[in-house]
């Protein structure tokens, strides 16, 4: 039997080769395939057995039951039913099981723990360093660096009920620096694609924002020249921050034709304030793909749900409001047992 260390080393190398497969990514304008990353965060996570191919048998199945290390080719097996849409991509896929989560287990709410590999809670001081998605965004830079979208809970958690706004997400830019996530497709499109908006009012607003930033940059720069010591350093930091936003806007303007071409075309229902959870996820996914395809970013993090998320719009139980926390504790919904509900969400 392989040692855990050797097995993990080979598995990670396999995952790395998957990420470098040219066919997975659209080429950019220079013909070079960019590396792109999507992180999906779920409140209840995935039970280990839901990732096991149903066609395992014999020795392999026995090793799986004993939680022993082994490797199989996915080409020789069928993916779990819920992963069926990815069957054509098994050649570029790795399912890596058995990693310990003890370093980031905190209880009911993980905050930045799972992507940061530390025990985070609601206190900013618990954020020890940047999460893995932000580290990758630094290694593979883009105009917007990183985008986070989330289906926030209607009560408590990061958003404190502001599910359609911009609130603390599940990623971190650095120590004590939580990232902010878009809570609805509507606000995400308004903010991310405002530079190519066809709406007259949005165009005016965008130009006003640009002029305000230009004025602020000039004012802060002039003020810094008259100061000394700590005060000068503070003002310079403000000035540098404003200039970084202006530089980002300049990059976005230079990409306007590509962004406009790949901007998401969503039905009106995705802009409603009372959007159901499933449609919210679909809307977020469309926006995430648009930003990746257009090259606005190379890293997207999508929080599909968290424990306080009240699910609506779920197939076969559309009229039910599903409490994800209760499902995690085994509570059935309608005629479906908790495990069946987990499969649906």
Predicted regions and their residues:
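Ligand-binding pockets and gating/stacking loops
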Residues: 2-345
